[in-house]
């Protein structure tokens, strides 16, 4: 089977859950069961596919989907670590962290979708400057300098929120 390693508080790991609603297997899907279910301390756990860590107050902090984390020359960078900063900038409707390049390490790039009323060149220039300034302060280790602007980002039709960045 798979090796399971518990992480220490403050370390990033995959969020796994156990409890009465966690099923032992997927119906007629042994591959999916093998990939996402495991037994630990006599409980069945489900791998959520999300990354997170427990902070000093033992609050679980969500960092994004495991499949969407990018590996940069400075180390792994999770989507929410970056997007949570970018999305607080006035004029940003939503953002997506992507990696530029065909193989690891990739160069981090922030794609923004501006709010209506912020789609002219002057506003976009101001937004991009503010985004890069905030990232330089909050995530200096990653040296994020690449940005793109799109009129809209592709989202999941059911939620209108989950960004399709792997397409």
What are these regions (language model features)?
Residues 6-9, 76-79, 121, 125, ...:
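Short, solvent-exposed loop/helix junctions and linker helices
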Residues 2-73:
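Conserved ATP-binding/catalytic segment of the ANL
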Residues 59-63, 68-69, 79, 94, ...:
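AMP-dependent adenylate-forming
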Residues 22, 36-37, 59-87, 111-122, ...:
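Adenylate-forming
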Residues 12, 43, 57, 67, ...:
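Active-site lining segments that contact anionic ligands and/or coordinate catalytic metals
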Residues 17-19, 112-114, 159:
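Flexible glycine-/small-residue-rich
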Residues 2, 49-51, 85-116, 143-146:
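C-terminal boundary motif of the adenylate-forming
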Residues 96-101, 110, 132-167:
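Conserved C-terminal "lid"/linker of ANL adenylate-forming enzymes
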């Amino acid at each position: 089977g798979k090796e399971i390693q518990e992480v220490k508080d403050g370390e990033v790991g995959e969020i796994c859950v156990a409890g009465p609603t966690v099923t032992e297997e997927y119906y007629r899907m042994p591959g999916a069961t093998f990939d996402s279910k495991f037994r630990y301390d006599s409980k069945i756990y489900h791998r959520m596919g999300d990354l997170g860590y427990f902070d000093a107050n033992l609050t679980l902090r969500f960092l994004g989907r495991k499949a969407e984390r990018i590996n940069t020359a400075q180390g792994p960078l999770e989507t929410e670590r970056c997007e949570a900063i970018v999305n607080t900038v006035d004029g940003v409707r939503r953002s997506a962290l992507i990696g530029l390049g065909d193989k690891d390490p990739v160069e981090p790039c922030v794609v923004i979708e501006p709010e209506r009323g912020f789609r002219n060149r002057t506003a976009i220039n101001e937004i991009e400057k503010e985004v890069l300034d905030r990232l330089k302060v909050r995530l200096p280790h990653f040296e994020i300098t690449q940005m793109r602007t799109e009129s809209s980002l592709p989202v999941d039709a059911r939620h209108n929120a989950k960004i399709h960045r792997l397409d």
